[in-house]
């Protein structure tokens, strides 16, 4: 075996598919956004909660029927006691487990918010990741729809706190009970029609994708897509299809409310659902939220299979350019509704709950499109350079660094190979450091430091043509007593901030 064969192979650095690294800019942008969301939730009287990223798989409801192995939608492993655990799929199922497990200690109504990563073991694609952040708020133990109305108002306030103007968003509200009433009215009530009702729900969930014509085919005989694949329909007749499409096609609720009430009159839940929608409309209007902010809209159909009452969705109405270069409406950034059954499956008794979830990554994309994120400037640290490596000199450099930090100024002492001073200035330039502190043996002997304004120096370097003039001018560099270090650095940073404001047209 030759030496080449003996040489161990390098491990290839690679990121798992569907996952991303988050850099400083992304992390700061998310922190800035979530801080504003958190402030709104706190004002509404909600408290934070954190649950583990792992839950027992059955708590997430992710076992296939007649199977002892979790389905493919979750990342799972077996504990040493052979119980299956999975990374959480959303933040709602862990909340339900927490409430059920601590029910006797929790004060109802329980108002909580959570932010954290969720995981989907699904095929990744453009903009589709296996790990992403959600920010949820929920009220558990509040049966009245006033809790749902409050959620809608909180969603609207959150979007405005993030800088999204009225007219650029709307929170749309529907009610699962009304749809149940419509389905009952067309003959799809009863347990024996559960499968057909599910097919109807799945068909109308495609309204945004296929439009009314495509949904009509899915409600009726079926639909063939462009590739020739056929999807079997729900088997409704034309009269049934027309009533379903009337419901999901309502654009002006006030104009259609009486006809809708007539359609669901006599059904077990439909009339109750219409009454709840009207109640929500009255509550939000009384609180000053007009239809430009919160709108009753039966065309909201996403998630109706999951929710048991009101369902709501926050949509952004401004245009963005998609990956094909087309102008499209940005669309949904969050939604939720009433899910009275989720906690109840642990308890064996009814536990009403309502809440919503914000897709943090998607909302961050929207805010970047609007120029509402990342505006908070982050100043890179002042660099204290190292001219000498003896203990006394290092002690002086470290003290300067700590003095700057104690004054609230970001600062770092150079930790690389200090013997090549040019590399220190290159590091400062690439890092974007605003100021460099320099003290050699001569300066240390006289108790002074050199302070170099790197931003001004970079600007002036374009105006001085030869090295001799540059050295003579000692561009943007001052010598001050060590005792004046902090004050002088603060003065330079303030001047740089003023320059940035002028450049941005703020003054």
UniProtKB/Swiss-Prot annotation:
Record-level Gene Ontology MF annotations: ATP binding; histidine-tRNA ligase activity
Keywords carried by this UniProt record: Aminoacyl-tRNA synthetase, ATP-binding, Cytoplasm, Ligase, Nucleotide-binding, Protein biosynthesis
Gene behind the chain: hisS
Designated name of the protein: Histidine--tRNA ligase
InterPro entries: aa-tRNA-synth_II, aa-tRNA-synth_II/BPL/LPL, Anticodon-bd, Anticodon-bd_dom_sf, His-tRNA-ligase, HisRS-like_core, HisRS/HisZ, HisRS_anticodon
Subcellular location: Cytoplasm
GO biological process, one term: histidyl-tRNA aminoacylation
Subunit details: Homodimer.
Gene Ontology cellular component terms for the protein in this record: cytoplasm
Catalytic activities: tRNA(His) + L-histidine + ATP = L-histidyl-tRNA(His) + AMP + diphosphate + H(+)
Enzyme type, top EC level: ligase
SUPFAM superfamilies reported in the protein's UniProt record: Class II aaRS ABD-related (SSF52954), Class II aaRS and biotin synthetases (SSF55681)
Top-level taxon in the UniProt lineage: Bacteria
Pfam family, one: HGTP_anticodon
UniProt similarity note: Belongs to the class-II aminoacyl-tRNA synthetase family.
Entry's EC annotation: 6.1.1.21
